Amino acid sequence: MNGFLVCQRGNFLKWYGTSSFSRTANRGVHISAEARINERIRVPEVRLVGPNGEQVGIVRIEDARKLAFDADLDLVEVAPTAKPPVCKIMDYGKFKYEAAQKARESRKNQQQTVVKEQKLRPKIDDHDYETKKSNVIRFLEKGSKVKVTIMFRGREQARPELGYRLLERLANDVAEYGVVETRAKQDGRNMTMVIGPLRKGKK
């Protein structure tokens, strides 16, 4: 390999030399949580990236493993389909831990999405309407989606326009807090619409 690398156990110091491989070439590389590491990498040579993103160049796999060992880190294959494969010296245990943490946080955020329901009658009076509207706003401010249900009875079922108008009015009145995700539609005797909370910064 071109140049030389100064290493101490547990401390990857600096690579001295030149390389035609761009220092930014490894940015944005996706590392699989099941990537091959250390002795599992069985190719004659690799393009090596240091722990701080420095480009070491193309080296023999034996040399790459030794550099990782001397730095008290792991050799991780980050681009197996490249020719030669790209490997990075890094703390693989720390990487897997952080990846697992991100996955758990993502699942937690998905599970926290709650759908509340608010029911209205098509001929609701103004006072009740304001109360229902306040409930919808409160749900949206807490980050919940709201399923708004218009309940028709008897002859009211022959006048779906009452439901459409009421839902349109409500959507306009809460537009500062939420956006319609599912437009008004008939659902048996009822009519439903789903409003989702606005993302932060979009109010």
From Swiss-Prot:
SUPFAM superfamilies: Translation initiation factor IF3, C-terminal domain, Translation initiation factor IF3, N-terminal domain
Keywords: Cytoplasm, Initiation factor, Protein biosynthesis
Gene Ontology biological process terms, A to Z: ribosome disassembly
Subcellular location: Cytoplasm
PROSITE patterns in UniProt: IF3
Gene3D superfamilies according to UniProt: Translation initiation factor 3 (IF-3), C-terminal domain, Translation initiation factor 3 (IF-3), N-terminal domain
Job of this protein: IF-3 binds to the 30S ribosomal subunit and shifts the equilibrium between 70S ribosomes and their 50S and 30S subunits in favor of the free subunits, thus enhancing the availability of 30S subunits on which protein synthesis initiation begins.
Assembly with partners or alone: Monomer.
Protein name, entry field: Translation initiation factor IF-3
Gene name tied to this protein: infC
